[in-house]
Amino acid sequence: HNPTGTVLDPAALREIASLVQSRGAYLLVDETYRDLGATADHPFATWLGERVISVASLSKAYGLPGLRLGWLMTRDRALNERFLAAKEQIVISGGVLDEEVGYQVYRRRSVELPAITAAVARGRAAVREWLATESRLEWVEPAGGVVAFPRIKADAGVDVARFYARLNGEFRTWVGPGHWFEQDDRYMRIGFGWPTPTELAEGLVNVSRALGAPG
């Protein structure tokens, strides 16, 4: 889940799929981060039934947003034909070179992913170590993905509006404020998958600096 990093276990997903099936609805499952970490061995959600739709892309887990490549899967043949018809009306086809690059990366995923997952683990560890020393923030450590969603403690004495103004204007550092996700701005999304280790470390220091001197 973005931004919390919560991972839905297979049993819970099966229960939701069963409920959806009984109501004649469809379940759309975003599996963009599926290939990272513990979820890599999970079957695609489409195996849960014909009314389950799975979507994913090469943008997140593989770090290739510039290719603009993704996919949609469903076992409902009639629905699949409707999706194909819609795609033809919107884009007709993707770039052949882009698709070839994406294909080659995906077919080599057993070679590419270990380095990516190791980098993600290092980023998560860096955030964990930083938060262990940052008493004004609290979090639930993400089980998957490449983002964390800590929040400023209610009793931390931090002026939230001033924090964001300083973080952006003075320190030129950006996080996703809570209102992006219909949450209080005491929450912030911090990404640890894309930045280099140096960039991430500097960004975390800047968050602490923008929070102000500890009380």
What is each of the regions a protein language model found here?
Residues 158, 166-174, 181-215:
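PLP-dependent enzyme catalytic core of the Aspartate aminotransferase-like
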